[in-house]
UniProtKB/Swiss-Prot annotation:
It is a multi-pass membrane protein. This is K(+)-insensitive pyrophosphate-energized proton pump. InterPro entries: PPase-energised_H-pump (IPR004131). The lineage of its organism: Bacteria, Bacillati, Actinomycetota, Actinomycetes, Kitasatosporales. Its EC number is 7.1.3.1. Its main location: membrane. It is found in: Cell membrane. GO terms for molecular function: diphosphate hydrolysis-driven proton transmembrane transporter activity; inorganic diphosphate phosphatase activity; magnesium ion binding. GO terms for cellular component: plasma membrane. Mg(2+) 1 binds at residues 225, 229.
Length: 801
């Protein structure tokens, strides 16, 4: 941070008014909009292919219908809750400074559009996933021949089931990239040079909804999962997804609202937020070209995602389903790199002096070729995605040493399993963070002495990574679909023998894809947040110039300087690091509280209905679904308020310099924490799978019980707290970007008003403290049986029949 005030300066002019959307660029953006619509058309084709498959037996259909009903009930209630919140934010955005009312109105309207698109992406993922899972199970059932029938071709059956699952993910991937690109291109077409400011609202809408879907879905899924495992596997000794466990339907619902809806919304907002930063910085660094080129790169990604999704066609020579998925990913990445190279050399000029609309004298006078900067920056993002995929796979796959070591540690008990998993998570966080950091720094160096070009290169690296998002979302959705398919098969009892083995193999591949995509999602979040950090710096520079102040150099006010040696900035840095820990703790505590209620409800049903164990009585699945729904929605408020109000409190209390340090602290700590939580949880999960496959005693052994405990600890790590850090970073950066002009306005110049600053800061702090206090007052102990029973009695048993 201190280095940002030395050779890289903002003292030269950065007026952006000269950049315009030329007629040629307008045509290009319109074509990009058509490409986005084409992605939605392809999604429609894939939906028809998936739904054309058979649904299996009546028992399988009944279980699938229960999962569908529970998922719809949860998301419906969540959307109603978030709808009220979105309307409030819509009007609050109108109060923030803007050049004119047209900009203010556009920012607020596109906030709602961003929120709607994010919710649509998540809902679409959930809607199709809960319909395709039974079709995957039905396809696998074909592997077991009926009496008198010849043996089936297991490879062909496995490939059919896998294709259904991956095409489901392809639909979600196409919606993610299609809606993200459509929203951004529409803003550019309507607002032209003002588009970056309006896109801030679009990005905030996408980010807020994604964070709530991530946190809420994560709490729901892991409360049900942990509760089901503790009572079912550990206490009752019954298998996973056993129909006698009242939490199994809620567990399957959670897979969809957490992994499908949550991840889709998460990557959609990464898409939107990265485009926001790239257009803001591109307008300053590349002038007229900067309003179109950041859209060209992800448009190429849409086309290559289509190729990658259809390239995932299993072959007989493949060692596993993962081979086909890796092939699709790398085909998409290679095609993206090649097409971006063509686009760069066709679209961009060969000299910085030929970039129209750039008023920064230093950029116009710079030697070198802007095409090289653009090409290398995008390549860094694409290569980073591939490296993160391999690194995450190393620490989480069952065939690699880290997971095998955790599996071996199960021979000495649960404590050593937990310790080994923590060790793997901590170590993997270092390597992943260094890899992401090198990627960001490598892109930054491309700018030379120009801070604006350096920051734009970081944003372009983010757009390069986004070229793989379509396939990444497909890979992630594949996981819960295959997991749910296995659950439906086990609960129905209609898929046995070879068919059950097909689903077991698919589930193992799905666990790996989920772990890998979490790593890449973290990388996209960090690059997006880093690019937004650059946009934030540009915003405070512009705001400071408007009130006649300088950001750096002699005479610059202390709390405008991005200098870590200043006490207020150091406090901001520490606060940014601390908020990540608080956010993670709140998320894990929420799972613990909800899981406690689930545990006591499932225990109550086993105690009061002994016929459940011999199948003479039916568990009340709906009660557990409703407990998870109510708890997840109740727990949303505190993390959400923390993410939005903490930057406001820091900014209005300590100034924009400290707020910049706060963002830097959050990005650094958030990167390490997110990777640690995701990889340790993924490693514990696959260590359990390793033992269940027959190693170290297999199912029912003491080693298996130890790995179940490790997996239970890892569940809220990898599926609640870890993934929720991604949108947290982007929400805080966007809030800082939006409030920066207001902080400067009330701190300097004619509108300086200390009273307003203090009032806003105190109000924000009081709300945060109050929300955390209320959250902490709720019982955290799993043994709080009275609290669990109160929750149980208030549950509505009619959610799922």
């Amino acid at each position: 941070m201190a280095g940002l005030s030395t050779p890289h300066q903002f003292d030269h002019p950065t007026a952006l008014a000269a950049a315009v959307l030329t007629d040629d660029n307008r045509v290009i953006v319109m074509v990009i909009g058509v490409v986005a619509l084409a992605a939605l058309v392809v999604a429609g084709i894939l939906v028809r292919q998936v739904l054309a498959a058979g649904e299996g037996t009546d028992s399988m259909k009944k279980i699938a219908a229960a999962v569908q009903e529970g998922a719809n009930a949860y998301l419906g209630r969540q959307m109603r809750t978030l709808g009220v919140f979105a309307v409030v934010v819509f009007f609050l955005l109108m109060l923030l400074p803007a050049d004119d009312w047209n900009q203010r109105a556009g920012r607020s309207v596109f906030f709602l559009i961003g929120a709607l698109f994010s919710a649509t992406t998540g809902y679409t993922g959930m809607w199709l996933a809960v319909r395709s899972n039974v079709r995957v199970a039905a396809a696998a059932r074909e592997a077991t021949p009926a009496e008198g029938e010849p043996e089936k071709d297991l490879t062909a059956v496995s490939h059919k089931a896998m294709k259904i699952a991956f095409r489901t993910g392809g639909v979600v991937g196409m919606f993610t990239v299609g809606l993200g690109l459509l929203g951004a291109s529409c803003v550019v077409l309507v607002y032209a040079a003002d588009a970056p400011k309006v896109l801030e609202g679009f990005g905030l809408g996408a980010a807020l909804i994604a964070m709530f879907m991530r946190v809420g879905g994560g709490i729901f899924t892991k409360a049900a999962d942990v509760g089901a495992d503790l009572v079912g596997k550990v206490e009752q000794g019954i298998p996973e997804d056993d129909p006698r466990n009242a939490a199994t339907i809620a567990d399957n619902v959670g897979d969809n609202v957490g992994d499908c809806a949550g991840m889709a919304a998460d990557l959609f907002e990464s898409y939107a937020v990265t485009l926001v930063a790239a257009l803001i910085l591109g307008k300053a660094a590349f002038g007229d070209s900067g309003l179109a080129f950041p859209l060209i790169v992800p448009a190429i990604g849409v086309l290559t995602a289509m190729i990658g999704i259809f390239a995932v066609a299993p072959r007989r020579a493949d060692r596993s389903g993962m081979s086909a998925i890796n092939r699709g990913f790398f085909v998409s990445a290679v095609f993206s790199l090649a097409l971006v190279a063509v686009a760069v050399y066709v679209y961009l000029p060969g000299k910085y002096a030929d970039l129209d609309g750039v008023t920064d004298v230093a950029i116009r006078a710079k030697d070198g070729d802007p095409r090289i900067l653009a090409m290398v920056a995008v390549a860094i993002g694409i290569v980073l995605a591939a490296l993160i995929q391999q690194l995450t796979g190393y620490f989480t796959e069952t065939t690699r040493r880290p997971v095998r070591d955790i599996g071996k540690s199960s021979l000495t008990g649960a404590a050593t399993v937990v310790l080994a998993g923590i060790s793997v998570g901590l170590e993997s966080a270092v390597y992943t963070a260094l890899l992401i950091g090198l990627g960001v720094y490598g892109a930054f160096l491309l700018g030379g002495t120009s801070i604006m070009l350096a920051l734009f290169a970081v944003a372009l690296a983010g757009t390069g990574l986004l070229t793989t998002v379509g396939v990444i979302v497909a890979m992630d959705t594949f996981g819960p679909v295959s997991d749910n398919a296995q659950g439906i098969a086990e609960m129905s009892g209609d898929v046995t023998g070879a068919g059950a083995q097909v689903l077991t193999d698919l589930d193992a591949v799905g666990n790996t894809t989920k772990a890998i995509t979490k790593g890449i999602a973290i990388a996209t979040a960090v690059l997006a947040a880093s690019a937004l950090f650059g946009s934030y710096r540009d915003a405070i520079t512009t705001a400071a110039n408007d009130v006649g102040e300088k950001v750096s150099g002699a005479g610059a006010p202390m709390n405008l300087m991005m200098d870590i040696s200043q006490p207020n900035n150091l406090v901001g840095l520490i606060a940014g690091a601390a908020v990540v820990f608080l956010f993670s703790g709140l998320a894990i505590n929420a799972v613990s509280r909800s899981a406690g209620a689930v545990v006591y409800e499932v225990r109550r049903q086993f105690r009061e209905h002994p016929g459940i164990m011999d199948y003479t009585e039916q568990p009340e699945y709906g009660r557990v679904v409703d407990i998870c729904t109510k708890d997840a929605l109740r727990e949303l408020a505190t993390p959400g308020l923390l993410a939005v109000l903490a930057p406001i409190a820091i900014g209005f209390t300590l100034g924009v310099g400290a707020l910049g340090a706060y963002l830097a602290g959050a990005i650094g700590t958030g990167t390490l924490m997110a990777v640690f939580l995701a990889n340790s949880g993924g490693a514990w999960d696959n260590a359990k799978k390793l033992v269940e496959d027959g190693h170290h005693g297999g199912k029912g052994s003491e080693a298996h019980a130890a790995t179940v405990i490790g997996d239970t600890v890892g569940d809220p790590f990898k599926d609640t707290a870890g993934p929720a850090i991604n949108p947290l970073l982007k929400v805080m950066n966007l809030v800082a970007l939006l409030i920066a002009p207001a902080v400067v306005k009330f701190s300097y110049g004619e509108d300086k008003n200390l009273g307003v600053r203090i009032a806003i800061a105190v109000l924000s702090i009081l709300v945060i403290v109050g929300a955390v206090y209320i959250s902490k007052r709720r019982g955290i102990a799993v043994g709080d049986e009275g609290n669990a029973e109160r929750v149980t009695k208030s549950a509505d048993p009619a959610v799922v029949s």
